[in-house]
C-alpha cells in the first residue's frame, strides 16, 4: 500500500492517518514526548501496515528533523526497528517488544536537539539547477583512477601528494606515517628520472556515459568522492543531485561509495561513521518507491561525511601491504 492510500484511512482511535503522521512529526520537532507516544501507539494499534509506516516516519524524522545535530540518530532508530521486527510478531493489544522499540525511538528523537536544515539545502540545489547552474567537474577529480587522469599521466604516487586526490579536510592525526611509507614504496616505480607510466586494465562503463547536464559519469563519480574528502559540501551536494537524476545505476554506485568512504576516508577520524552510513544505505531500500525520501537520505549522508574528521590510515595500510606483496617483500 502506497503512502497516498495509507493517509486516506483513519486510525483505531478515529484520527485521519495523514493528520496523525503530521502531528507525530510536529511532536518530535517540539520534543513533546507524551503526545508523540500517544499518537504513535494509536497508529500501532491500527494495523501492521501502520506500524511499518510509523517506522518510516521515525526514520525520516531522524534524518530531516534531528539531522546534523545527531548524525547517528538514524542508525539508532534503524537498530530499534530491527529489534522490533526480529523479536516478536505483531500483537497490538499485547504491546510487548514492538511497542517498547518505537516508544524508545520516540523518546530518543524527542530528546535530541533538532537541526532541520536538510530541506533548505535540497531546495538550494534544485533552485541552482533551475537557474542553469549545474554541478562541475574540478581538475582534482582527474587522477589515476579514471581515463582522463591516466591520459594526463597521473599515477598512484601523485595521488598521495599534498594536493593530490587523497587530500582530506579536516584531516585527523594518524595517517601520516603510513602515507610516508607508501610514498617510499611507490617512488622507485613512479618517481625519479625514469618514472613508469601507470596502466590499468580496469574498465568503468560509466566512462562512456553522461549525466543529464553533460557531465562524464566516470569523472562525476571521482569528483563526488574527492569533493567529500575536501569537505566541499555545496559542491558535493550538487554532484550528488546530478548523479541522482542520472538514474538508478548511478544512485546505487553513490551508496556503494558512501559506505566505502566511511571506512576508507573517514577511518579513525570518526569510527562510528561506518555504522551510520551502513544504516543510511539499508534504510534507503525501504523507500524504493519514494524518490524524495531517497534523495533526502543521500544528501544528508553526504553532509555527514563532509563534516567528519578524516583519517585515511586504513586505506594506506592496505596499500602498503598490497605493494609489499607486489615487490616480493611478503610471501
Language model features with spans:
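GIY-YIG nuclease catalytic motif and its immediate N-terminal context
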Residues: 1
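Metallocofactor- and cofactor-centric catalytic cores in central/energy metabolism, strongly enriched
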Residues: 31
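Noncatalytic carbohydrate-binding groove/subsite architecture in carbohydrate-active enzymes
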Residues: 231
Amino acid at each position: 500500500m502506497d503512502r497516498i492510500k495509507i493517509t486516506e484511512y483513519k486510525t483505531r482511535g478515529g484520527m485521519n492517518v495523514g493528520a496523525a503522521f503530521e502531528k507525530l512529526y510536529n511532536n518530535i520537532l517540539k520534543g513533546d514526548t507524551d503526545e508523540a507516544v500517544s499518537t504513535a501507539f494509536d497508529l500501532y494499534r491500527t494495523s501492521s501496515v501502520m506500524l511499518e509506516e510509523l517506522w518510516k516516519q521515525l526514520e525520516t524524522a531522524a534524518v530531516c528533523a534531528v539531522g546534523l545535530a545527531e548524525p547517528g540518530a538514524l542508525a539508532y532508530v534503524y537498530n530499534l526497528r530491527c529489534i522490533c521486527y526480529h523479536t516478536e510478531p505483531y500483537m497490538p493489544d499485547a504491546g510487548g517488544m514492538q511497542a517498547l522499540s518505537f516508544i524508545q525511538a520516540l523518546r530518543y528523537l524527542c530528546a535530541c536537539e533538532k537541526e532541520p536544515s536538510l530541506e533548505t539545502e535540497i531546495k538550494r540545489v534544485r533552485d541552482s539547477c533551475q537557474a542553469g547552474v549545474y554541478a562541475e567537474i574540478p581538475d582534482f577529480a582527474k587522477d589515476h583512477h579514471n581515463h582522463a587522469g591516466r591520459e594526463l599521466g597521473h599515477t598512484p604516487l601523485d595521488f598521495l601528494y599534498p594536493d593530490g586526490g587523497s587530500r582530506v579536510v579536516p584531516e585527523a592525526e594518524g595517517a601520516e606515517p603510513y602515507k610516508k611509507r607508501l610514498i617510499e614504496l611507490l617512488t622507485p616505480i613512479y618517481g625519479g628520472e625514469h618514472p613508469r607510466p601507470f596502466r590499468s586494465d580496469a574498465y568503468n562503463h560509466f566512462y562512456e556515459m553522461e549525466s543529464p547536464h553533460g557531465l562524464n559519469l566516470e569523472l562525476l563519480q571521482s569528483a563526488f568522492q574527492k569533493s567529500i574528502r575536501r569537505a566541499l559540501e555545496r559542491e558535493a551536494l550538487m554532484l550528488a543531485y546530478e548523479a541522482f537524476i542520472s538514474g538508478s545505476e548511478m544512485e546505487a554506485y553513490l551508496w556503494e561509495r558512501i559506505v566505502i568512504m566511511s571506512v576508507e576516508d573517514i577511518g579513525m577520524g570518526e569510527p562510528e561513521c561506518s555504522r551510520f552510513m551502513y544504516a543510511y544505505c539499508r534504510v534507503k531500500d525501504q523507500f524504493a518507491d519514494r524518490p524524495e525520501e531517497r534523495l533526502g537520505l543521500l544528501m544528508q549522508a553526504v553532509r555527514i561525511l563532509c563534516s567528519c574528521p578524516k583519517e585515511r590510515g586504513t586505506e594506506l595500510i592496505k596499500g602498503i601491504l598490497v605493494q609489499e606483496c607486489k615487490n616480493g617483500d611478503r610471501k
